[in-house]
From Swiss-Prot:
LRR repeats lie at residues 106-127, 130-151, 156-176, 177-198, 201-222, 224-245, 246-266, 269-289, 294-315, 316-335, 344-365. PROSITE patterns: LRR (PS51450). It comes from Bos taurus. The modification Pyrrolidone carboxylic acid is found at Q19. One of its GO terms (cellular component) is extracellular space. It comes from the Eukaryota. Binds to type I and type II collagen. The modification Sulfotyrosine is found at Y20, Y38, Y45, Y47, Y50, Y53, Y55, Y63, Y65. PANTHER family: AGAP008170-PA, FIBROMODULIN. Glycans are attached at N127, N166, N201, N291, N341. This is Fibromodulin. Disulfide bonds join C334-C367. It is found in: Secreted, Extracellular space, Extracellular matrix. GO terms for biological process: collagen fibril organization.
Length: 376
């Protein structure tokens, strides 16, 4: 059966039997000769928020079309721009501001990014409770100068940008309406279990590039969370339980050394997991840790693995470069190898390990028949 399968595959690849006898690793060489590129399917770091009301030029949008600019409403703070064409947006970014100006009640989108603001005083948004979007990234805000209830009255707030500041803890309480919370590039060291309480509508949480050592069970109540980014922190263990709706998990550049058995079972929609640049060893991984049928991409590069961990046959991209792997076990990809059972893996990176091309077993072409790139 094995020889028949090899003959069939060789015919599909336009390779002769003579070629196979001459080089038992013809299949590996064939893949290396194919033109393949690695495209990151998702960029998890959108540092600058998309502005729904584009305001280009000092004279405003109307000026670009040849019509004279309309006068700004009288309630607009003199430090800011309030384009008449977009009456619910207020632009106060890049003005060297050291304080938050008055916000008119009609505003829904306010931009205070890239200033020298160090505090968010209590009641500063009480006049504009209909706010949907607040951008405060790129300032000098510290946790001790954030009003305790400064966001509590904003019952419609959906996006809050507080990244690139000097925060040491997550502001609380936050409105239930919040969908995106950007707290990356701060100095947050821990996430208490109740820090994110009530945020049942939150879909994206960015906490990368902080000093977080533990998060406990703070993520369990985030039932709508799709994206969680905790990369570039000081975590030694993964969060205690993941939200059931989670699709993207980023934990690279931490100090994680183990992942519990069936850890991802409670997140049946999980597609992308990145755990590169940690301290993972095979002793810290159970046999079913990554055997999740929903996973499409798994990045375990630059750890301390010596063996390829078992993965689901549905996995499409597996990155294991920069480990200490010294053997190629086909059972990590296919528990049964035949014509009807095979892996959907398309990209496999094993470069920078202790494994050689000759370590690939003879039945690898049958199991990994869909692979377009294998690097050793």
């Amino acid at each position: 059966m094995q020889w028949a399968s090899i003959l069939l595959l060789a015919g599909l690849c336009s390779l002769s039997w003579a070629q196979y006898e001459e080089d038992s690793h013809w299949w590996f060489q064939f893949l290396r000769n194919q033109q393949s590129t690695y495209d990151d399917p998702y960029d998890p770091y959108p540092y600058e928020p998309y502005e729904p009301y584009p305001y280009g030029g000092e004279e405003g949008p109307a000026y670009a079309y040849g019509s004279p600019p309309q006068p700004e409403p009288r309630d607009c703070p003199q430090e800011c721009d309030c384009p008449p064409n977009f009456p619910t947006a207020m632009y106060c970014d890049n003005r060297n501001l050291k304080y938050l100006p008055f916000v008119p009640s009609r505003m829904k989108y306010v931009y205070f990014q890239n200033n020298q603001i160090s505090s968010i005083q209590e009641g500063v948004f009480d006049n504009a409770t209909g706010l949907l979007w607040i951008a405060l990234h790129g300032n000098q805000i510290t946790s001790d100068k954030v009003g305790k209830k400064v966001f509590s009255k904003l019952r419609h707030l959906e996006r809050l940008y507080l990244d690139h500041n000097n925060l040491t803890r997550i502001p609380s309480p936050l409105p239930r309406s919040l969908r995106e919370l950007h707290l990356d590039h701060n100095q947050i060291s821990r996430v208490p279990n109740n820090a994110l309480e009530g945020l049942e509508n939150l879909t994206a949480l960015y906490l990368h590039h902080n000093e977080i050592q533990e998060v406990g069970s703070s993520m369990k109540g985030l039932r709508s969370l799709i994206l969680l980014d905790l990369s570039y922190n000081h975590l030694r263990k993964v969060p205690d339980g993941l939200p059931s709706a989670l699709e993207q998990l980023y934990l690279e550049h931490n100090n994680v050394f183990s992942v519990p058995d069936s850890y991802f079972r409670g997140s049946p929609k999980l597609l992308y997991v990145r755990l590169s640049h940690n301290s993972l060893t095979n002793n810290g991984l159970a046999s079913n840790t990554f055997n999740s049928s929903s996973l499409l991409e798994l990045d375990l590069s630059y750890n301390q693995l010596q063996k390829i961990p078992p993965v689901s046959t549905n996995l499409e991209n597996l990155y294991l470069q920069g480990n200490r792997i010294n053997e190629f076990s086909i059972s990590s990809f296919c528990t049964v190898v035949d014509v009807m059972n095979f892996s959907k893996l398309q990209v496999l990176r094993l470069d920078g390990n202790e494994i050689k091309r000759s370590a690939m077993p003879a039945d690898a072409p049958l199991c990994l028949r869909l692979a377009s790139l294998i690097e050793i």
